[in-house]
From Swiss-Prot:
It comes from Homo sapiens. One of its GO terms (cellular component) is membrane. This is Transmembrane and coiled-coil domain-containing protein 5B. The chain crosses the membrane at residues 243-265. Residues 17-207 form a coiled coil. Belongs to the TMCO5 family. Pfam families: TMCO5. The lineage of its organism: Eukaryota, Metazoa, Chordata, Craniata, Vertebrata. Keywords: Coiled coil, Membrane, Transmembrane, Transmembrane helix. It is a single-pass membrane protein. It is found in: Membrane. It comes from the Eukaryota.
Length: 307
């Protein structure tokens, strides 16, 4: 049963771990794509800036050549001054653009740092999730083991209750058999009583008729009376024997009923007397019964307590 309980737990663990890894992989792919896009933008801007710088250098070189050629003329000087001003303006613009690029580079570096922090946080979260899943699996294994132990205990108790129920049903069958036998014995006893009464009436009638009989028939009457007395004694012995059988049968039935009551109070419903006595007895009798049984039910532990 432990192998059957561990397989679904391992499957749940693998599914949970695979789903978490897929989510982390998707997050990493998104972050990598964002980084690549930002780096591409940065490269494009750097290339544009380099082209502009080259163009400006070319213009500066051309202007320098023009300045070298037009040093003699004032107009050329004015133009040169004008060109210088333009060059200064272009240099300012270049400085502004370089400052913007530096700001964008700083922003990109901050974004890269944040992405690295997020990636490290994701890995730490994955480690924490693995620890939590391990703890959950251990708790589930412990609960499963406890449930299997409780199921085994319940099965043992169920088997015990079934055996007790079988014994109780056997007792009930025996009681039904004995009750039938008791009814048959009572029927036979009634029949024998009726026969005894009839024989007594016949003997009385014979005694009454014997008073009018001749003296020669006295011997026959005495023998007949002796025979009747012996039969009556035999019937009395049979009655006493049947009474004894009936008494033993009742004792056995009482013992079986007492055993059934003890079994019921011990295993099925120990609070039967507590539930039934208030319904059967009155309050006064219950109080008197409580007063009588209280000294026997309490434990005398005063001598065992420390002073």
């Amino acid at each position: 049963m432990e192998d059957v309980g561990q397989n679904p737990l391992d499957d749940v663990k693998n599914i949970f771990f695979a789903s978490s890894l897929e989510a982390v992989k998707q997050n990493l792919d998104c972050l990598n794509s964002d980084l690549e896009k930002d780096l591409q933008k940065l490269d494009m801007e750097n290339q544009v800036l380099l082209r502009k710088i080259k163009e400006k250098e070319e213009t500066i070189s051309s202007l320098e050549r023009k300045l070298a050629l037009s040093l003699e003329e004032a107009k050329e000087e004015e133009e040169l001054n004008y060109v210088i001003d333009e060059q200064e303006e272009s240099l300012r613009e270049l400085e502004l653009e370089t400052a913007k690029l530096e700001k964008s580079n700083a922003i990109l570096s901050r974004n890269v740092v944040e992405v690295q922090k997020k990636i490290s946080g994701l890995f730490t979260n994955i480690g924490l999730e693995e620890e939590t899943t391990k703890q959950i699996l251990e708790e589930m294994k412990a609960r499963l083991q406890k449930s299997t132990e409780s199921c085994a205990k319940q099965e043992e108790e169920l088997a015990k209750i079934e055996s007790d129920y079988q014994s109780v049903s056997d007792l009930c069958k025996d009681q039904v058999y004995y009750i039938k036998k008791y009814q048959e014995v009572l029927r036979k006893m009634k029949e024998e009583k009726e026969t005894l009464l009839l024989e007594k009436q016949i003997s009385k009638a014979q005694d009454d008729s014997s008073q009018t009989v001749k003296p020669g028939s006295i011997l026959a009457d005495t023998t007949q009376r002796n025979m009747e007395r012996t039969t009556i004694k035999k019937q009395e012995r049979r009655c006493w024997y049947k009474y004894f059988q009936y008494l033993t049968f009742m004792v056995l039935v009482f013992i079986r009923l007492l055993a059934y009551v003890i079994f019921h109070l011990q295993y099925i419903n120990p609070d039967l007397l507590v539930d039934v006595l208030p319904l059967v007895l009155s309050r006064g009798t219950l109080e008197s019964l409580r007063k009588v049984s209280h000294p026997f039910l309490t434990l005398a532990v005063e001598e065992a307590l420390p002073h």
